[in-house]
């Protein structure tokens, strides 16, 4: 196995909360997949959840080498958690297509947050 992509992103939670207050759920719908949006709607700390998902998706797009561009959208990345709470990243759409071209076999995702910031790192291995 070899690392074929590495991406990290940091999001300011307050900035995400301000975007939510301006545009409401429209901002969340732009970032989140359907399953993520359903979970988001149940939460009290929506801004924190969205900041972590935003950072993870930006990190994944950087690891892919495209950013959110060239046909890759936020909806191409879905973050869920396994039974132990470990974050899991699933690719779809253009991101999945590009990952197959790069022979990506393993995806590693870590997400962390503290009072002001959320940070995520993604590693793609062949």
UniProtKB/Swiss-Prot annotation:
GO term, biological process aspect, one: fatty acid biosynthetic process
Main location as per UniProt: cytoplasm
Domain of life according to the entry: Bacteria
EC number, UniProt record: 2.7.8.7
Pfam families reported for this sequence: ACPS
Positions bound to Mg(2+): 9, 58
Annotated GO CC locations: cytoplasm
Any one Gene Ontology molecular-function term assigned to this protein's record: holo-[acyl-carrier-protein] synthase activity
Subcellular location field: Cytoplasm
Keyword terms: Cytoplasm, Fatty acid biosynthesis, Fatty acid metabolism, Lipid biosynthesis, Lipid metabolism, Magnesium, Metal-binding, Transferase
Keyword Lipid biosynthesis carried by entry: yes
UniProt key word Nucleus: no
Cofactor: Mg(2+)
The reaction(s) this protein catalyses: apo-[ACP] + CoA = holo-[ACP] + adenosine 3',5'-bisphosphate + H(+)
SUPFAM superfamilies: 4'-phosphopantetheinyl transferase
UniProt xrefs under InterPro entries: 4-PPantetheinyl_Trfase_dom, 4-PPantetheinyl_Trfase_dom_sf, ACPS, Ppantetheine-prot_Trfase_dom
Function according to Swiss-Prot or TrEMBL: Transfers the 4'-phosphopantetheine moiety from coenzyme A to a Ser of acyl-carrier-protein.
Family from the record: Belongs to the P-Pant transferase superfamily. AcpS family.
HAMAP family: AcpS
UniProt protein name: Holo-[acyl-carrier-protein] synthase
Biological source species: Aliivibrio fischeri (strain ATCC 700601 / ES114)
Gene for this chain: acpS
